[in-house]
Amino acid sequence: MAPAMESPTLLCVALLFFAPDGVLAVPQKPKVSLNPPWNRIFKGENVTLTCNGNNFFEVSSTKWFHNGSLSEETNSSLNIVNAKFEDSGEYKCQHQQVNESEPVYLEVFSDWLLLQASAEVVMEGQPLFLRCHGWRNWDVYKVIYYKDGEALKYWYENHNISITNATVEDSGTYYCTGKVWQLDYESEPLNITVIKAPREKYWLQFFIPLLVVILFAVDTGLFISTQQQVTFLLKIKRTRKGFRLLNPHPKPNPKNN
């Protein structure tokens, strides 16, 4: 009976530790998100950093780190109000005993125009948004976006650039120009890098379900085999018992007489 108990355990372990999309279902690092989603902001603006977990543990408190120093904030959200230059730098968060998040870098500027991006490093296939932002949200007209020194897009009224599926060809140096109060201004350049998506996950999406199917097949096979063995042993036992009932007294051996 032992084999029948061991294999379901293996199957359960596989189902617990592997998610349907082929990713290990173990506690992952938390991730810091920004709202608004720009990591380059003007002095005096507000931004909220949120430490997003994966709900593996019930989060009771959060640790925030700014440039390596522990913050007094223990909530899952860190509010930066009336941003100062000192608020620039690296931010990380941590939930309980889970590893620290990957760092997020915030930059505080004082300028007339600021090119903002949803991310400076983008995974291939992910969306990318660019914004030519005016100081104190002042209107910007005759906006031109540039990539690697060449004009990319022009609008008389300011609009964002939306790239639905970023490719490695979208990597480059971006900046924007525009008019604020009838004066021409140019933003600081921003380097955008699009990296290729890792290929390992694709084969994992096929391997993990296959592993579960194999474990299930082994589990079923062992269960059937064990059932057959038990049935066979019970049949032998019943046969021997029936034979003893039909022959309660053994026949005498003539040689002993």
From Swiss-Prot:
Q: Gene3D superfamilies of this UniProt entry?
A: Immunoglobulins (2.60.40.10)
Cytoplasmic compartment ranges equal 225-257
Q: Which domain of life is it from?
A: Eukaryota
Signal peptide start-end: 1-25
- Localization terms from the record: Cell membrane
Q: How does it sit in the membrane?
A: Single-pass type I membrane protein
- Which parts of the sequence belong to the Ig-like domain? 30-110, 111-193
Residue intervals on the Extracellular side = 26-205
Pfam families of this UniProt entry?
Ig_2, Ig_3
Q: Provide the Gene Ontology terms for cellular component.
A: cell surface; external side of plasma membrane; plasma membrane
Residue ranges annotated as transmembrane are 206-224
**A GO MF label:** IgE binding
Q: Which InterPro entries match?
A: Ig-like_dom, Ig-like_dom_sf, Ig-like_fold, Ig_Fc_receptor, Ig_sub, Ig_sub2
Q: Which UniProt keywords apply?
A: Cell membrane, Disulfide bond, Glycoprotein, IgE-binding protein, Immunoglobulin domain, Membrane, Receptor, Repeat, Signal, Transmembrane, Transmembrane helix
Glycan attachment points: 46, 67, 75, 99, 160, 165, 191
Ranges in a coiled coil: none
So which tissues is this one expressed in? Answer: Expressed in eosinophils.
Q: Name one GO biological process term.
A: type 2 immune response
Disulfide pairs here are: 51-93, 132-176
State what this protein does.
High-affinity receptor for immunoglobulin epsilon/IgE. Mediates IgE effector functions in myeloid cells. Upon IgE binding and antigen/allergen cross-linking initiates signaling pathways that lead to myeloid cell activation and differentiation. On mast cells, basophils and eosinophils stimulates the secretion of vasoactive amines, lipid mediators and cytokines that contribute to inflammatory response, tissue remodeling and cytotoxicity against microbes.
Per UniProt, subunit arrangement is:
Tetramer of an alpha chain, a beta chain, and two disulfide linked gamma chains. Interacts with IGHE (via CH3 region).
Kindly provide the name given to this protein in its UniProt entry: High affinity immunoglobulin epsilon receptor subunit alpha
